[in-house]
């Protein structure tokens, strides 16, 4: 009798738990359905997740387990291939768009959509002169501050120094007796390059100080925004304060140099020079805090993604010997046909690297360094009969498009030759976004990667220590050992 009573009680508790969990799980969805019931159009299909945390746990589970595509695939399996879904991520009700035309529409509509990053990213990468301004001001600032990195003439000025950084870095890596974390080393290379481009500095002390703080800053980008000691977000905020203190003396020194007049032998203007001179539409110069914000934001954006792309391009080439062989032959042909008096790369030669360019594009497609781009609706918007409510975040989920067999046959396969005579349809290739906020550093990033791969392919090879290492995609796609490997010199070509 007692056993029967215990079994009945346990069964009752189990049923109550299941129905109770389901009830609580649906509260978020019911709340927004009721709140928006008077709107002309319905919300897209989807899952709003648990109260307060939304669907964040599922996102973290899928992206940290090495199966990031499961998050979108589960939505497609449950709600069909609509290309637009509702969810609740990073503390905000959100709409995911993962169909090319819809993605392009959101990215190119500056009237109804603005930048809409999660709170953690907003706080850590704040950049008022580029975010909290009108579209006209944004275009002005963008044109001015990106002038050092846009156009062949501008990029040509960095070739010699970038080559020097790459050659010295590869030589140093190959001389190390112990394995290195390739991702960390690529961050060092990329950071040296971007500091030179934006700040005109080769000061190793500054580079080291800034680089160490950026690691903590980056780790907090998708963290829970709790500013309490012990939390990742708090550590990231402290790192940002350190960065501001490091950058400010550099700005002060440059301001003094400008006030004292042009120096003998001074050449191009770098980003600091431009930021100290630029004025807004009311004729006001930027505050020091704004200059610091812009420098930190651009330095961050300009090296993290490039370094990760570099690491993956080397990894993919190493995993596919036939692709590596073809890429190497192209680079050797370029050096074989140059004039004997020419010792360095030229932009003309980089333009001739057709197959290497395909390797880079395929790396960007497969690695999906940024899984999504963030926007916020500034008005109620109707897309395909569904409403995107004003104030909701919009996640342009490029990863889902890049890994969709409808646009890329055998999407899991690393195949640079897929780009032969291939014209990507609008919205199907979005590694740098689209529209007026298209990443201005795209050409610079490709230039850095091309130079590095040129010298790596000709003279070095990679020997991974854990080739089957687990891959996590949180916050970006990378092996959990940061690609522990040896860089081995194989030639003196």
Curated annotation (Swiss-Prot):
One GO molecular-function entry: ent-kaurenoic acid monooxygenase activity
Any one Gene Ontology cellular component term annotated for this protein: membrane
PROSITE patterns: CYTOCHROME_P450
Major localization class: membrane
Cofactor: heme
Signal peptide coordinates: none
Origin superkingdom: Eukaryota
Tissue expression per record: Expressed in roots and stolons. Not detected in leaves and stems.
Binding-site residues, heme: 439
Stretches of the chain forming a coiled coil according to its record: none
Subcellular location: Membrane
Keyword entries, A-Z: Heme, Iron, Membrane, Metal-binding, Monooxygenase, Oxidoreductase, Transmembrane, Transmembrane helix
Membrane topology, record value: Single-pass membrane protein
Transmembrane portions of the chain: 7-23
Applied value in biotechnology: Saccharomyces cerevisiae expressing Glycyrrhiza uralensis CYP88D6 and CYP72A154, combined with the expression of Arabidopsis thaliana beta-amyrin synthase (beta-AS) and NADPH-cytochrome P450 reductase 1 (ATR1), accumulates glycyrrhetinic acid (GA) and, to lower levels, beta-amyrin; these GA production was increased in the presence of G.uralensis cytochrome b5 (GuCYB5).
EC identifiers of the protein: 1.14.14.152
Protein's GO biological process: brassinosteroid biosynthetic process; brassinosteroid homeostasis; sterol metabolic process
Catalytic activity: beta-amyrin + 2 reduced [NADPH--hemoprotein reductase] + 2 O2 = 11-oxo-beta-amyrin + 2 oxidized [NADPH--hemoprotein reductase] + 3 H2O + 2 H(+); beta-amyrin + reduced [NADPH--hemoprotein reductase] + O2 = 11alpha-hydroxy-beta-amyrin + oxidized [NADPH--hemoprotein reductase] + H2O + H(+); 11alpha-hydroxy-beta-amyrin + reduced [NADPH--hemoprotein reductase] + O2 = 11-oxo-beta-amyrin + oxidized [NADPH--hemoprotein reductase] + 2 H2O + H(+)
Family label: Belongs to the cytochrome P450 family.
Note, other: The CYP88D subfamily seems to be restricted to the Fabaceae.
Function: Involved in the biosynthesis of Glycyrrhetinic acid (GA), a natural product which exhibits anti-inflammatory activity. Catalyzes 2 successive oxidations of beta-amyrin, producing a precursor of the triterpene sweetener glycyrrhizin. Unable to use 11-deoxoglycyrrhetinic acid or ent-kaurenoic acid as substrates.
Record-given protein name: Beta-amyrin 11-oxidase
Protein source organism: Glycyrrhiza uralensis (Chinese licorice)
Origin organism lineage: Eukaryota, Viridiplantae, Streptophyta, Embryophyta, Tracheophyta
